[in-house]
């Protein structure tokens, strides 16, 4: 793994209080976590190096923890974000309904409308009778957002369990992959804009030179 040439991908974890964002981050980072502890309050981040499509990625994961309870998330928090993991709990109807609010917060208020997002339905280890949000409902939400907002990236959906380590690596690798694609997309756009601007400037210079050499008969 060539860490010196790694690409920085910044991922933000969003969602309601106590849906398992912090626990999921701990499990992915390989740390021991006390599942009986109280929900996290504050902001924390960790860095982990992974390989995606033969590219070394420096994955910087930012966890909003319980900060959303106090509505103190600021624009600067989302600066240089590459991708967002949007969480709800499969046993909590309200947390699923609130993903629209979180989506609006991150992708409209903070001008990140076309940034990639991965939808995460956590706590699938709970007994089936406690599940109130089905996979079909979540995938339908993803499809509707894609169509309604004409997003350049589709929204993948994963069902996860931090407790049983189900699909935890998958969601972060998916976020990193989408983040890389977003970087390529933005670089291509910047190059196109640069070339177009150069072409326009070049045409203006040519026209100016022509104007300088013109003879006007009065």
From Swiss-Prot:
For this protein, the record's InterPro entries field holds:
P-loop_NTPase, Small_GTP-bd, Small_GTPase
Give the propeptide segment as residue ranges. Answer: 216-218
Listed Pfam families: Ras
Going by the UniProt record, its keywords in alphabetical order are: Cell membrane, GTP-binding, Lipoprotein, Membrane, Methylation, Nucleotide-binding, Prenylation
Residues annotated as binding GTP: 15-22, 63-67, 122-125
Molecular function (Gene Ontology), one example: GTP binding
Task: Point out residues bearing the modification Cysteine methyl ester.
Answer: 215
Q: Where in the cell is it found?
A: Cell membrane
Membrane-related topology note: Lipid-anchor
What name appears for this protein in its UniProt entry? Ras-related protein RabO
